[in-house]
Amino acid sequence: MGKIIKWILRSALSLLALVVVGVAYLVLAVDPNDFKPEIKSAAASQDVELTLDGNLSWQFLPQIGVVVEQVEFAHGSIASGKIGELSLSVSWSELFNIDLSGKQLPVGSIAINDATILLAELAPNTFPVQLKRFNARVNNFSLTGDRFSITASAHVFSGLALELEALLRLQMNTNTGVIEQITVSDLEASIDGMELSGQLNAENNFAIAQGSLRSNHFDLQQLVKTIGMSFPLVKLPEMASKDALTAVSWNSSFNTDMNGLSTFNTQLDIDSQIINIASKVDHSIHNLYMRVSGNQFDMTHYLAADSNS
């Protein structure tokens, strides 16, 4: 992840440097397409294979920048994809304050439109995830701890709609690619009827993290059916009540230390029945402790449809 951000930083600086040149020559004397080899070289230095089959053009309103069409990329076995249109821009007021030393990205915007992205392995022993019709916009992007916003949408699996928006603060060492600190606030996301909100604060490449995440009441049956369209083995049995698992919500908080003790506390609301789950992970000895508690839980609605007991 750090290498990808580092590559985006350097590539963005290279492209935004073209903006300065373009303004100096009133844009007419410079064709940004002539700089494709330099952009590919900057990507290759970060182990990213880049193909630029489309046109590069200037953008003037509402901000000045560069628009790149038909981008293909591959970053080893981590991610690959195609981007219909990528734009990098900077506000007019910040245009002449750009630091071209590579240490800081100027205040500006990054927009990705109509992309297809394959995430090969989000975590060990997981399956690839493909994001289709991926669109995203980042405003006032910064790697020095200043706050910026992000909005994104995509379709995953068989049309499962994802939407996300949040405010972030990101402090990254651009020399090593290490994320020293990241703060996510005002997180709002939706996944096919399930709405999520929360916040996160992490340090040292997520070695230490604290945060919380909660959902609305959503129809778990419908969500599993949608996922099952792509993964037939993912399905729920027919239960005694057709309303079982149609009003589910959860509220979770966590405090993790990958070199010490991590704690997770979750309250599940399953059709108005409350279950509390408290767990601890001792990473030093690879032990998991878990306690599940609740006043009572009526199982009659969740038994097999033909069960008489």
Stretch-by-stretch model annotation:
Residues M1-L18:
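N-terminal Sec-pathway targeting helices
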Residues V20-A111, I117:
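Terminal hydrophobic membrane-targeting helix
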Residues E49-T51, S77-V90, P124-A136, F157-R169, ...:
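Amphipathic hydrophobic-ligand
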Residues A79, P106-G108, A207-A209, S262, ...:
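Outer-envelope beta-barrel architecture signal
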Residues G102, F134-S153, T183-D186, M239-Q267, ...:
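Solvent-exposed beta-strand/coil patches in large extracellular/periplasmic or lumenal scaffold regions
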Residues G102-A209, S215-F218:
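Elongated, acidic membrane-bridging lipid-handling scaffolds
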Residues T126-P128, G228-P232, D306-N308:
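Flexible, surface-exposed loop regions and adjacent strand-edge segments
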Residues F297-N308:
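Soluble, acidic/polar mature domains that operate outside membranes
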